[in-house]
């Protein structure tokens, strides 16, 4: 059972591990799909929205050369749209960091 409350989590996604042995022309689209799958599993929502800054970061080196890791913030928010199928959605945002060394998954205040 998924808790019905807003929350926010900062985590690091290892894209190199997720997209290993994927053909060159499918790496960036697969990276986006893997981030969506991780967000669905972690936050327990079916509606996942990728921020444009994260999309630009993934595609910054082209379709073949994706970054090895990316630090993201997963924000579970209440869906205010009328006629929405799900009560909550997850927004995935990019966090800029200098080094990934020693970073852990952290709960943060929901914005």
From Swiss-Prot:
Key words, A-Z: Ribonucleoprotein, Ribosomal protein
Cellular component, GO annotation: cytosolic large ribosomal subunit
GO biological process entries: cytoplasmic translation
SMART domains (UniProt xref): Ribosomal_L31e
SUPFAM superfamilies: Ribosomal protein L31e (SSF54575)
Family the UniProt entry places it in: Belongs to the eukaryotic ribosomal protein eL31 family.
Protein name, entry field: Large ribosomal subunit protein eL31
